[in-house]
Amino acid sequence: MITKEVTICGKQVTLAYCYATEIAFKNMCNEDMFDFTKHAIESIQAERDPDIEKTIYAIIASMMAYYEEKDKAPIKDTDLMKEAKPVEIGTAMLAILSMRAEFYHVPEGEPEEKQKGGKKGKNH
């Protein structure tokens, strides 16, 4: 499991990336995390906002992977949707993208196609 701390709604929140993150995201969105992150990276590179609804689901999935139960997280999903600042959402999304790359051992600048089916993370 890879973890990073971010500030959301004025609170320190630990996000995690592991297989549980991918499973939770798929259950919420019915989309593979690989496909979502690929589109998010393309949007960021084109200076467009990624799909905000799926971005929030990715953050919730990442919080659930760390805290195991939504009620244990320092913020609730409703806080995230209603009170989080755009910069906080963006920072959290960049943290998730970074953790995913680290989990799959993808060097910076590596083509996205190599991430799917790559080496398993060091802590799975």
Model feature map: region roles:
Residues 1-12, 31-50, 67-124:
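Charged interaction scaffolds used for protein-protein
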Residues 54-58:
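Elongated alpha-helical scaffolds
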Residues 46, 59-60:
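Conserved active-site "lid/cap" helical segment
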Residues 22-29:
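Short Gly/aromatic-enriched secondary-structure transition segments
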Residues 16-17:
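Short linear motifs in exposed loops
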Residues 60-66:
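Helix-loop "lid/cap" segments that line or gate small-molecule binding pockets
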